[in-house]
């Protein structure tokens, strides 16, 4: 990461935090109970909060992987990825959405 990129990242974060009201995280300060876990591709063109019109923290649990994969392997067994399983088991989330996108290079590579 270049110094310019790091500076821009920090400036963007400062603008973001400065734009929030002081009580923005008050409702989720003591824990989270998201309604939905949404697994998408980690592609930078797939912004989850915008896709689901999320206006406040706490409603959407947002993991992402290359190619929106929800499986992992442990001891030779196929299991649900922990970033999807955690909200379903530990936070009471009842809905899981797996979202792909047009032109996904990971999916294309897997199919070829």
Task: List where the protein language model places each region.
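Short, conserved "active-site rim" segments that organize catalytic pockets and cofactor/ligand binding
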Residues: 2-78
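Short HxH-centered metal-ligating active-site micro-motif
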Residues: 58-112
């Amino acid at each position: 990461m270049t110094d310019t990129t790091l500076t821009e990242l920090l400036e963007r974060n400062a603008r973001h935090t400065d734009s929030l009201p002081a009580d923005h995280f008050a409702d989720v300060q003591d824990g989270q109970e998201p309604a939905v876990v949404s697994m998408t591709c980690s592609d930078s063109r797939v912004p989850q909060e915008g896709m689901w019109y999320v206006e406040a923290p706490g409603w959407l649990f947002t993991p992402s992987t290359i190619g929106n994969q929800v499986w992992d392997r442990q001891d030779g067994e196929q299991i649900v990825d922990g970033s999807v399983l955690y909200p379903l088991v530990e936070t009471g989330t009842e809905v899981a959405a797996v979202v792909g996108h047009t032109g996904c290079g990971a999916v294309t590579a897997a199919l070829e």
